[in-house]
Each structure stands twice: as structure tokens, then as C-alpha cells.
């Protein structure tokens, strides 16, 4: 591994060789299992029932009691099971794909005319960090609302910064 010395930091070689490879085509899965703990904080609470038809982007679990994130369907299809995962007491929603990947017809672009509306849109989206803690993004941005910081610009850097990782 090559290291370059800098006065204030260590720079690892990026080694993102797979970035030059042909993209992998991923087909729609036949089933998804969405746990209610895909974020830090309280568990999300299912709002769908077995037998319900769901669409891509449809809200299927609301935020838990505190510091939580909602969960949305990632495929269209039928809810086949809501049960604890084998690893513990965390509920998961099982969805069998209908193969159509139909978007939720009720989805609309959020209206964001100020910081509060922006923060609410981020909260409702269920967006969380990709780090190990899956920290809810709205909680990070909440400092705008409570006055801890004055923020006039939010810059989203969606580029992967970790050496060797090209899949995020």
C-alpha cells in the first residue's frame, strides 16, 4: 500500500480499479425483506398489512417513538409477511415482487420554500447515512432548526471517499 505523507494527514492510495469495470446489471429481486431497524434509534413501525399491495417509494413503516426514520418499499408487489428476523426481535416486512416496479402514484415532489420544509422533506424521505450507524440525515441537519448553527447552504457530497470502495 502506498502512503504519501502530508504535514497534517495521511493519504492512502484510492485503488478504485473496479470503477473502470463494466457496470453490473441488477435485476429486480423476487422478494425483499426490509427490517425496521435500518437506521439508528427507535424501530420503525409497520403501517401495512400482510396481503397489501405496495408501490416503489410507498411509506410502509412510520418513524418510531424517537430518533427514528421511516421505511419505504423498494419494489412493487405484495406484503407476504411481517415477522421478527431470526437474529432477534426486530420486525421485518417481506414483499414479494410483482415484477413491475411501479412507483407510488401518490408520490409528489416535496415543497421546500424554507429550511423547516427542507428538513421535513429529508425526514420524510427516510434518508440515513451509509456509515455503520445509519444515522438519520434529518437528525444531522436538525442543528439548523434548533439554532445551534446558522446554516445558509447545504452541500451534499455523495462521492465515496473510502479507499477501495466504489459501490456506494
Segments and roles (model prediction):
Residues 1-163:
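Well-ordered secondary-structure scaffolds
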Residues 165-168:
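Glycine-rich phosphate-binding "P-loop"
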Amino acid at each position: 500500500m502506498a502512503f504519501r505523507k502530508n504535514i497534517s494527514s495521511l493519504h492512502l492510495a484510492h485503488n478504485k480499479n473496479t470503477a473502470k469495470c463494466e457496470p453490473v446489471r441488477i435485476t429486480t429481486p423476487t422478494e425483499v425483506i426490509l427490517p425496521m431497524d435500518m437506521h439508528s434509534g427507535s424501530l420503525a413501525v409497520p403501517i401495512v398489512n400482510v396481503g397489501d399491495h405496495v408501490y416503489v417509494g410507498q411509506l410502509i413503516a412510520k418513524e418510531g417513538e424517537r430518533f427514528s426514520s421511516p421505511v419505504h418499499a423498494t419494489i412493487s408487489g405484495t406484503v407476504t409477511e411481517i415477522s421478527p428476523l431470526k437474529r432477534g426481535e426486530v420486525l421485518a416486512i417481506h414483499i414479494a415482487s410483482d415484477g413491475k416496479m411501479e412507483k407510488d402514484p401518490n408520490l409528489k415532489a416535496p415543497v421546500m420554500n424554507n429550511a423547516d420544509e427542507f428538513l421535513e422533506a429529508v425526514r420524510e424521505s427516510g434518508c440515513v447515512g451509509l456509515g455503520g450507524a445509519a444515522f438519520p440525515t434529518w437528525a444531522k441537519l436538525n442543528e439548523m432548526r434548533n439554532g445551534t448553527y446558522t446554516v445558509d447552504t447545504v452541500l451534499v457530497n455523495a462521492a465515496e471517499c473510502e479507499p477501495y470502495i466504489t459501490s456506494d
